[in-house]
C-alpha cells in the first residue's frame, strides 16, 4: 500500500515538474534538491543499490531521479506520521472526533477529501483544535495536494490515499502507551522506509537501543 501511494506521488511529481506552471511545486522541490545536493555524495554503485530498495519509479529526468525519490519518500513519511498522530490524539479522547481517518474515508468526493487533508492535516486544523499549535509546520511536504488540480492525477491520487486510509483504519491506536522500554515506533518506521545507505549519505546515524541503555546504566 505504501509503495503504491509513493508511486502515485512520484507520478504526480514527475508530471508537475514536466509541465508549464506549477511554480509552487517546482520551487519546493528545487529547495529540497538543493539541500539534498549539499548533503549527499553518492557513487553510481550506491545509487543503484538505493534505487533498488525504494520500490517505485520516477518518470522525470534521470538527473534528479534520486532526490525526487527521496522527496517522495519523505512526503509519504510526513503524511503518514500526521495521520498516525491524529489517530493517537483521537483514540485517547483528546479530540471531538473519535477518528480522523474514518471521517476522511466517509467523504464522498475527491475534492472534499483533498480539501479536508489540506485544512485538517497539512494546515494543522485538527491539531490546532485540540491545542497542539505548531504541530504541523513543514509546508514543503504538502505539495501533493497542489498536484491534484489535474483530474486524472486527482483521481488516482485519491484512490491511493483512500487505500492507505483503509489500511490504517484496521489498527488500534488506543493501545499505544508510553513505557520505559517501549520501542520508538516512528523512528523504526523511518529507518525501514529510507534505505540505510541513503540515510548515512545524508549524515543520519542512530544509536542502537542496547548502546543507549548501556550508556544510561
Question: What are the residue ranges of the model-derived segments?
Answer:
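Charged, often flexible domain-edge or linker segments that flank or initiate folded functional domains
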Residues: 1-151, 205-208, 212-217
Amino acid at each position: 500500500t505504501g509503495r503504491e501511494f509513493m508511486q502515485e506521488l512520484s507520478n504526480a511529481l514527475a508530471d508537475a515538474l514536466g509541465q508549464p506552471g506549477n511554480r509552487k511545486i517546482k520551487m519546493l522541490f528545487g529547495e529540497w534538491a538543493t539541500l539534498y545536493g549539499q548533503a549527499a555524495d553518492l557513487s553510481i554503485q550506491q545509487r543503484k543499490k538505493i534505487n533498488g530498495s525504494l520500490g517505485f519509479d520516477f518518470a522525470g529526468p534521470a538527473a534528479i531521479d534520486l532526490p525526487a525519490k527521496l522527496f517522495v519518500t519523505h512526503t509519504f513519511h510526513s503524511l503518514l506520521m500526521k495521520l498516525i498522530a491524529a489517530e493517537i490524539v483521537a483514540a485517547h479522547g483528546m479530540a471531538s472526533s473519535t477518528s480522523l481517518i474514518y471521517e476522511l474515508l466517509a467523504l464522498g468526493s475527491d475534492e472534499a477529501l483533498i480539501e479536508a487533508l489540506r485544512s485538517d492535516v497539512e494546515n494543522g486544523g485538527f491539531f490546532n483544535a485540540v491545542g497542539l499549535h505548531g504541530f504541523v509546520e513543514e509546508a514543503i511536504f504538502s505539495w501533493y495536494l497542489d498536484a491534484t488540480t489535474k483530474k486524472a492525477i486527482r483521481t488516482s491520487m485519491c484512490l491511493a490515499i483512500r487505500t492507505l486510509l483503509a489500511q490504517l483504519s484496521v489498527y488500534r491506536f488506543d493501545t499505544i502507551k508510553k513505557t520505559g522500554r517501549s520501542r520508538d515506533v516512528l523512528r523504526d518506521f523511518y529507518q525501514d522506509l529510507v534505505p540505510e545507505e541513503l540515510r548515512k549519505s545524508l549524515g543520519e546515524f542512530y544509536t542502537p537501543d542496547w548502546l543507549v541503555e548501556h550508556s544510561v546504566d
